[in-house]
Amino acid sequence: MGNAVIASTNDVYAGVWNPAGLAALTPDDGLQLGAMHSEWFGGVGNYDYLSFSLPTTQGGNRLGFSLVRFGIDQIPNTLSLYESDGSINFDNLSEFSSVDYAFLGSYAKEINKGKGPIRFGGSVKVV
């Protein structure tokens, strides 16, 4: 996608949104760290993001690593709520969470040809 984005992402967050944006960072930008927390659906779901990006020894190349977590926490477990006689025992109520993790490795490169830079990048995601 190169620079074909509505809102340009050329920082550590580019690993998820547009990996080619990592190539816009210069070696002088050094190591970048980023973190984000967002609550979805009125606080029911939690979205967390942690990443870092660093330049390689070759100019114009950049690596990025990201961890994404989406979870729904404190889900009531009502399987043991009822006793054998049919009465309700709230002491048997417990909670659990449902969580998905994704790990991303990103690589970006910038090539300067003729009229301006050409940036490309890609990510490998493991869920």
Labelled PLM ranges:
Residues 2-127:
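Subset of outer-membrane beta-barrel
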